[in-house]
A protein has these predicted regions:
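Conserved anion-binding
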Residues: 9-40, 44, 73, 80-83, ...
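Active-site mouth loops of central-metabolism enzymes
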Residues: 16-29, 81-95, 155-187
Length: 195
């Protein structure tokens, strides 16, 4: 199932599926996913299913920049194709193992396979990747705020925070909040953003 490279027992793993555009189905980018999953208190985070290993490299690299947790990579054996009514995956064990070494070099610490992988894929993966050095994990000390889909790093640059959607002293805005008038609230937020 997977090769945990020198990490001992890792229990709580959280992985997400990313499309070829590098985002989840909800539009979350890898950086934000890494931040949110890290904050959840899991032991390892990463990417599963989705695509073949060749399409996961940039996602793994981006996640590594925003977490000190081990990174999981469990791709498919290529992209699924329908052949004679059957789902098949076109990446053989040799190619899969070579591509997984690239993922390990990109920062993945726990390597495995998802759809289309076989015991032979995992055997080749272990043979090819077992002696690769682990990445040096650095503790992160950034201050970051995040929604489900986007993160903002609060660095030394000044941040302008608008008052347009602060309800203090704004009767019309308070009423909009009370009445759940999202059209008005959104219009005010967009007006603030445009200034």
């Amino acid at each position: 199932f997977c090769l945990s490279r020198g990490l001992g027992d890792v229990y709580k793993r959280q992985t997400l599926t990313f499309a070829e555009d590098g985002r989840t189905l909800f539009g979350t980018n890898p950086e934000t996913a890494a931040l949110v999953m890290t904050a959840m208190g899991v032991d390892a985070i990463g990417v599963n299913c989705s695509t073949g290993p060749d399409k996961m490299v940039s996602v793994i690299e981006k996640m590594c920049r925003y977490t000190a947790l081990p990174i999981v990579a469990k791709p498919n054996a290529g992209l699924p194709q329908l052949v004679d009514g059957e789902t098949v995956y076109d990446m053989g064990p040799e190619t899969f193992a070579q591509e997984m070494c690239v993922l390990a070099e990109a920062g993945a610490d726990i390597l495995g396979g998802c759809c289309g992988t076989t015991p032979e894929h995992i055997k080749k993966l272990v043979e090819e990747c077992k002696d690769l050095p682990l990445r040096e994990i650095e503790k992160k000390h950034d201050t970051i705020v995040s929604s489900y889909g986007q993160a903002v790093i609060l660095d030394d640059m000044p941040r302008i925070i608008g008052e347009r959607i602060n309800p203090t002293g704004k009767k019309k805005f308070k009423e909009a909040l009370k009445n759940e008038d999202m059209d008005y609230i959104l219009k005010e937020a967009i007006t603030q953003q445009d200034k």
